[in-house]
Amino acid sequence: MRILRIYLDGAYDTGKSTTARVMALGGALYVPEPMAYWRTLFDTDTVAGIYDAQTRKQNGSLSEEDAALVTAHDQAAFATPYLLLHTRLVPLFGPAVEGPPEMTVVFDRHPVAATVCFPLARFIVGDISAAAFVGLAATLPGEPPGGNLVVASLDPDEHLRRLRARARAGEHVDARLLTALRNVYAMLVNTSRYLSSGRRWRDDWGRAPRFDQTTRDCLALNELCRPRDDPELQDTLFGAYKAPELCDRRGRPLEVHAWAMDALVAKLLPLRVSTVDLGPSPRVCAAAVAAQTRGMEVTESAYGDHIRQCVCAFTSEMGV
């Protein structure tokens, strides 16, 4: 069976989940966010907890160090169900093939969201340490052929309006985190383009600026990163590894952090990353994603029924 798998991703509340549900109405198999795992499966609500840690830090009832530890712990919990699902499904996907898909699976986020993108945004705004970011990013799993990741984009004002209108229990609007996330997802797109062009981070390291506190503060306040046709190293995720905490006195990465970037190259290179504007209606957005499928990679699998069973089991337990 020829299978097309699409990961819809991006900063929260862009409309990706609604778009994915519309695609499911057209016959796609939809894998929702594992909201139950985060909010109701255990004694603690991870979504509310990660916001509560920042509130307590701001009002002085929790130290910055303790808040960072709580946030890193909660961020790891966000990643867990994605990693478990990815580990289960990866062996079921075969080599790339030509021809139209016979099954389309639409995932609400790729593991890169919880292991790399959100941790980096949290590092930018000061919610977690550089060490926590590197540790979480190191858990990003490898990607077999056929990974098509579509990053949702949205006008900044409309994005903030949607976020304020959502009002999920335990959440609050964090404009700095939202700005950081928008920058980080632009970095993800640029990373894919940088790697696809054949460039190597070691060749450009010396020309990239430091990812110091001033740079991070700017990324939390201003939308500085945008998808570029020919990005520089500082426009990519690799630029974050030039944080002073991760380098020696001369600005060179410690060897273990160089290994971390090499691993990131190997894991992200197989992903085909594109963008889509989710400003229009959900039906128009779903059609826009569908229009991109002609350029996406399809894989062969002898386990179509098993994939469907796994997705149904995950959805019944983790969806809300």
Curated annotation (Swiss-Prot):
Protein's name according to its UniProt entry: Thymidine kinase
The organism's taxonomic lineage, starting at the top: Viruses, Duplodnaviria, Heunggongvirae, Peploviricota, Herviviricetes
Molecular function GO terms recorded: ATP binding; thymidine kinase activity
Enzyme Commission number(s) from the entry: 2.7.1.21
GO biological process: DNA biosynthetic process; TMP biosynthetic process
Binding residues annotated for ATP, in chain numbering: 10-17, 162
Pfam families listed in its UniProt record: Herpes_TK
Role summary: Catalyzes the transfer of the gamma-phospho group of ATP to thymidine to generate dTMP in the salvage pathway of pyrimidine synthesis. The dTMP serves as a substrate for DNA polymerase during viral DNA replication. Allows the virus to be reactivated and to grow in non-proliferative cells lacking a high concentration of phosphorylated nucleic acid precursors.
TM spans (from-to): none
Organism: Suid herpesvirus 1 (strain NIA-3)
Gene3D superfamilies, sorted: P-loop containing nucleotide triphosphate hydrolases
Broad enzyme group: transferase
Residue numbers annotated as active site: 33
Family, similarity comment: Belongs to the herpesviridae thymidine kinase family.
Xref: HAMAP family: HSV_KITH
